[in-house]
């Protein structure tokens, strides 16, 4: 409740203070009002999805160059035009699989910190996908985020691989068997190492 109020309050404040936010919201609500100007990118992306249909026009047969920044923000529109709705759904299923595996890693993690980290990273990944695909399909206003593992952009790619690496580490740690403890040992002794200091 509090988070929602803060989000919508911040969004309303940003809309009033920043002209580029107003421009993006206007493009989102009325893209065909200026199809050759501010709304050109979004209109061409929607046309690309429409031309692609169910199975697309064929790999390499589309015209993604009509969409500005098709290699980054709007790469999903290029996929939709050339390979159709089928390929777009396949991409979404792969992203869903990554999120599902991240949540599964959170569930099997033995420590609370690992659970929180895995859940948070799954939420970050899912939110990024929702924002990107929502913007390209006109579900929400455009933001300029890149599509994970598909869009051109070095820092975004590195950040997403770091997320995957952390999730793999949490999953690996959770799946390792617990050490066998003898009658005279306990977990604290296993985690403690005595270091002898030699005086010189």
Model-found features: residue ranges?
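A juxtamembrane structural motif centered on a specific transmembrane helix
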Residues: 133-200
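Membrane-interfacial segments
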Residues: 21, 103-110, 143, 174-179
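Alpha-helical transmembrane segments of multi-pass membrane proteins
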Residues: 11-15, 94, 121-131, 165
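Structural signal for the C-terminal ends of transmembrane alpha-helices
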Residues: 96-106, 167-174
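Loop-to-helix entry and N-terminal half of a specific, functionally important transmembrane alpha helix
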Residues: 106-144, 150
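Hydrophobic alpha-helical segments of membrane proteins
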Residues: 56, 86-93, 125-134
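Hydrophobic, glycine- and aromatic-enriched re-entrant/interface helices and adjoining loop segments
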Residues: 2-91, 109-117
């Amino acid at each position: 409740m509090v988070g929602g109020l803060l989000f919508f309050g911040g969004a309303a404040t940003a809309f009033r203070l920043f002209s580029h936010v107003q421009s993006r919201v206007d493009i989102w609500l009325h893209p065909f009002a200026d199809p050759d100007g501010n709304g050109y990118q979004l209109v061409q992306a929607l046309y690309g999805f429409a031309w692609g249909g169910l199975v697309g026009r064929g790999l390499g047969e589309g015209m993604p160059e009509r969409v500005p920044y098709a290699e980054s923000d709007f790469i999903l529109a290029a996929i939709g035009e050339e390979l159709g709705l089928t390929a777009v759904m396949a991409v979404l299923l792969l992203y869903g699989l990554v999120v599902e595996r991240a949540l599964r890693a959170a569930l099997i993690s033995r420590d609370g910190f690992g659970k929180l980290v895995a859940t948070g990273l799954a939420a970050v990944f899912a939110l990024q996908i929702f924002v990107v695909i929502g913007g390209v399909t006109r579900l929400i206003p455009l933001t300029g985020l890149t599509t994970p593992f598909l869009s051109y952009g070095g820092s975004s790619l590195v950040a997403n691989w770091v997320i995957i690496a952390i999730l793999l580490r949490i999953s690996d740690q959770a799946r390792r068997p617990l050490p066998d403890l003898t009658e005279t040992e306990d977990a604290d002794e296993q985690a403690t190492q005595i270091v002898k200091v030699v005086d010189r």
